[in-house]
Amino acid sequence: PAKVVYFGYGVYPISKNDGAARNQIVLSVNAHGFLNGQPREYYENLKNGELKGYAFNEKENQDPETTYFNGMMLRLIRSLEYVKSLPEWNGKDLTVEGHSQGGMQAAIAAGLDKDVTMAIPNQPWMCDMGGAALGHLRGNWHIKPTAALFYYDPVFHIRRYDGRLKVLAGLGDYVCPPSGMAALYNNAKGPKEIVYTQGAGHTGNAKGEK
């Protein structure tokens, strides 16, 4: 089996996850095009310079080809291609998972790659971006919706996926409201479940009544 893990918003290095790599391949993926394993100053310079506020640039977000998410999703596709090329992969079990921005990537990965068999988006970001115009809840940390960004809404991508899906939602999450997770769940075609945690904020490891 193989698992590909994606991570939340930010400018930081990604390290390998040996703890999860028991009896399976685990690939932890950096959403960006920079190097891992560099000195702290390397990431601080990117965080305060080139990548400051990445993905929030309104001009870039007018075109699906120029938005920051374009490169992010190309890296996502390549990560899956790489894992599937490994001779150790059994050729049939492929899981994608992640929290927040990583949850968004996991849901989109499921829609883009027909070989994904299990998707676990945990409080995924960017779900139901156009929903606010219809009176749906909107997170308090959101990107201004544009027509171009709808290409990157996980709610649409999940329609292409018919594998197993487990969505995790926090009922106290004001960054990625659970209504967006419900829209994602409702659009999925295959075997699916959604787990709501009472009072849970945008933690990624929600504790409380399920």
Please tell me what each predicted stretch does.
Residues 31, 120-130, 154, 199-200:
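Active-site nucleophile loop of the alpha/beta-hydrolase fold
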Residues 26, 119, 194-195:
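Hydrophobic/aromatic anchor residues within beta-strands of the central parallel beta-sheet
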